[in-house]
Amino acid sequence: ENHNEASACVEALHTRFAQFGLKLHKDKTRLIEFGKYAIERRERHSESRPETFNFLGFTHKCAQTKEHGWFTIHRHSIAKRVRATLQKIKEQLRKRMHRPIGETGRWLRSVVQGWLNYHAVPSNSHCLCRFVDEVTRLWLAVIRRRSQRGRSKWTWDRMQRLARLHLPRPRITHPYPNQRFRARLKAGAV
């Protein structure tokens, strides 16, 4: 919100880190215009949308709610990391190509469920659905490569039935931060 407060916070971080012999990385630490009024201020000055930043596996963006136009922060999984995860899954699927489908399905379920457990935050549902769809497509490609005869049997409809059987459904499991903090206040944790 306030540039002076943000600068003071950065100085305090430098001081605190120095006590433990640590330093903030200059290329990864910067002040950006972000927050409740950033969109309005940038529109007033005819500037583009507020900058985004990556933190803890998510790209954070200033946004407004569709219904009321209130400020909110959208968190989307970092695209580069999603691609890297899908590439690792693809490599593992190729190694497990001739394993029984049920065994591969159980393995995929645990991998996808672990990914969803972390990334299932509000405003990220599109990324979750896309991730599960991509895993399904990768699995279909590997199944079709198993034999020449089996290629025509494995249609997208059949693969979707198999995916529904083995892969978890993408859904938001983490609450909005304000709901989480409200629960902590009621419990007396803060």
Residue ranges of model-derived segments:
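Non-catalytic terminal/accessory segments
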Residues: 1-190
